Amino acid sequence: MKLFFFLYTFGLVQTIFGVEIKQGFKWNKILYEGDTSENFNPDNNILTAFAYDPESQKLFLTVPRKYPETMYTLAEVDTEKNSFESGDTSPLLGKFSGHETGKELTSVYQPVIDECHRLWVVDVGSVERNSDGTEGQPEHNPTLVAYDLKEANYPEVIRYTFPDNSIEKPTFLGGFAVDVVKPDECSETFVYITNFLTNALIVYDHKNKDSWTVQDSTFGPDKKSKFDHDGQQYEYEAGIFGITLGERDNEGNRQAYYLVASSTKLHSINTKELKQKGSKVNANYLGDRGESTDAIGLVYDPKTKTIFFVESNSKRVSCWNTQETLNKDKIDVIYHNADFSFGTDISIDSQDNLWFLANGLPPLENSDKFVFTKPRYQIFKVNIQEAIAGTKCEKNL
């Protein structure tokens, strides 16, 4: 390793709106356990998303291969051995335990853990850029893969390769949600994957090993989004990006809430329509969150009936209780910090903790080259009920 990196230190706990928000991990550069090639450049490794599993105490992280030399596109941190409570806030990323070489996947952007304790990723099948003199990764059709976290060494249990030409521009796939129709019947599962360039939703039917594309006018941007960095303002346009699922009805159907990256509106579609190939979808307009609330990530908590949004340029995390009509007056803020640059991922673990990530990477060309004087990658953790206590989102608890 020829490059030296400096980690900035600051408090592990920040008090925002009366609640302690624990900063889990922070990195200014992403480095890996083990040897790296002489072509390794940590600036080419961009952390995009994560999923935490309390049972194994593993934090799974995705680092898409923008360049082939990225060591692991799916990595993990053992939080029992590398505990941020004990001050180990910038651990090296290790190889995913279900892999032998770390080269089993070409490039992934997000991990999701479902109710059957499976870890899902979408391997987009291609590297964004090529570097001269570096052995390239094999290219293939986008592939959906799941691993069983209940078993030792996390064996691969699902692999579905999407048909030729069924997904346009796979490196522009955004977030996805895994819909286990009946928690006690894991075979009946659907996956909904967003594409923020083509403004489409890709549906995978696991039971029938089939997939199809859904499009709707509400999936596209309705304005230009702004991103401020280092005294300059940038603009971008991106379509449907974040998606989360509400509560099941008696037939196992739910509302799929979704965000368009360049919009402040929120919509939903009943999964009954998404699960029927060729069915016409009827999008529900739920309301507008207000000026400068653009976001690409959201998550629904069934216990508090609250949706949390990790916002793009406001440097904050907000909430809305779904029992209320959505408008700017019903939105509240649970976290705000000037160093939180471009919130990109948010999730809830099985112990009712809310986790969220900023990575300073808006969908702008060469945004991976932005320079940060504070840690670029910041992961935070907070108990949900503590987070919404005293806010507009606390209702009927």
Curated annotation (Swiss-Prot):
Keywords: Secreted, Signal. Residues 1-18 form the signal peptide. GO terms for cellular component: extracellular region. Salivary gland (at protein level). It comes from the Eukaryota. Its main location: secreted. It is found in: Secreted. Pfam families: MRJP. Coiled coil: none annotated. Probably modulates blood feeding of sand flies on vertebrate species by binding and sequestering different mediators involved in the host response. Binds biogenic amines. Binds adrenaline and noradrenaline with high affinity. Binds serotonin. Binds dopamine and octopamine. Exhibits anti-inflammatory effects in the host: reduces IL17A, TNF-alpha (TNF) and IFN-gamma (IFNG) production by host lymph node cells, suppresses expression of MHC-II and CD86, reduces TNF-alpha production and increases IL10 production, in host bone marrow-derived dendritic cells (BMDCs) stimulated by lipopolysaccharides. Belongs to the major royal jelly protein family. This is Yellow-related salivary protein LJM111. It comes from Lutzomyia longipalpis (Sand fly). The lineage of its organism: Eukaryota, Metazoa, Ecdysozoa, Arthropoda, Hexapoda.
